[in-house]
């Protein structure tokens, strides 16, 4: 927070810094977000008080739009500067969640919205239309279900300063011994899927998100399918824990 008379100049400084940063990231291969969910968007350049208010609105008045925004902005992390800004924001978010525990159920329901990446006959579910018709979307169908599950469970456990999905599952495995195997398998699966996407991106000089299954070997397809069991297991855990049936 800054004095009111300094707010406009301070915001302008950080927007300019963000635009320089996002341009540099784009230059080295990070695609611009088509929905403009980037630091260079003035909408996301706010004071600590404004961010506290923003998260409070998302938690207390959830909607399809706020669920999408929550999935993005609950994964913030400290980069540089005053660590107390992050601590105070986290304190505010966790206090609001304590007062509104039903929001965990909202997040969990959102986390299981994507079905298993395999169909009834264990075939890959592929895109049915658009530019990527018949391609497998490894981000939406395999990575995001794990990311979303780890996020809601970590928030429910009040975990701080762990914003990578594999690390979250590893910490959850320590906290919940009865579900240790599920969490460890999820951590392994996430790292394997991320490695697979990276390899595909390097091979095809793209993001690696959409995969042409015909180009994969039988062994690669089997490896992918083994990872999918963890998605089913963690979604089943969420369904039971948050009474989603």
Question: Where do the PLM segments sit?
Answer:
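Conserved catalytic core of two-metal-ion nucleotidyltransferases
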Residues: 3-72, 81-96, 103
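Small-residue (G/S/T/A) turn/hinge positions that recur once per unit in extracellular repeat modules
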Residues: 75-77
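Conserved nucleotidyltransferase catalytic core and NTase-mimicking acidic/glycine-rich helix/loop elements
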Residues: 80-245
């Amino acid at each position: 927070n800054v004095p009111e008379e300094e707010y406009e100049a301070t915001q302008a400084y950080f927007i300019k810094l963000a635009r320089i940063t996002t341009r540099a990231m784009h230059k080295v291969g990070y695609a611009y977000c088509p929905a403009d969910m980037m630091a260079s968007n003035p909408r996301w350049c706010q004071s600590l008080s404004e961010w506290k208010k923003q998260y409070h609105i998302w938690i207390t008045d959830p909607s399809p739009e706020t669920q999408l925004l929550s999935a993005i902005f609950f994964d913030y992390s400290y980069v540089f500067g005053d660590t107390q800004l992050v601590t105070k924001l986290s304190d505010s978010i966790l206090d609001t969640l304590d007062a509104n525990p039903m929001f965990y159920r909202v997040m969990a329901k959102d986390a299981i919205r994507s079905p298993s990446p395999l169909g009834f006959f264990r075939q890959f579910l592929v895109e049915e239309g658009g530019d990527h018709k018949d391609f497998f979307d490894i981000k939406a169908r395999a990575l995001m279900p794990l990311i979303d599950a780890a996020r809601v469970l970590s928030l429910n456990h009040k975990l701080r300063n762990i914003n990578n999905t594999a690390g979250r599952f590893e910490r959850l495995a320590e906290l919940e011994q009865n579900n240790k195997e599920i969490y460890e398998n999820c951590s392994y699966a996430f790292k394997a899927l991320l490695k697979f996407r990276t390899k595909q991106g390097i091979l095809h000089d793209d993001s690696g998100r959409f995969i042409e299954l015909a180009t994969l070997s039988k062994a690669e397809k089997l490896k992918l399918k083994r990872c999918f069991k963890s998605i089913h297991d963690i979604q089943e855990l969420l369904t039971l824990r948050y009474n989603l049936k």
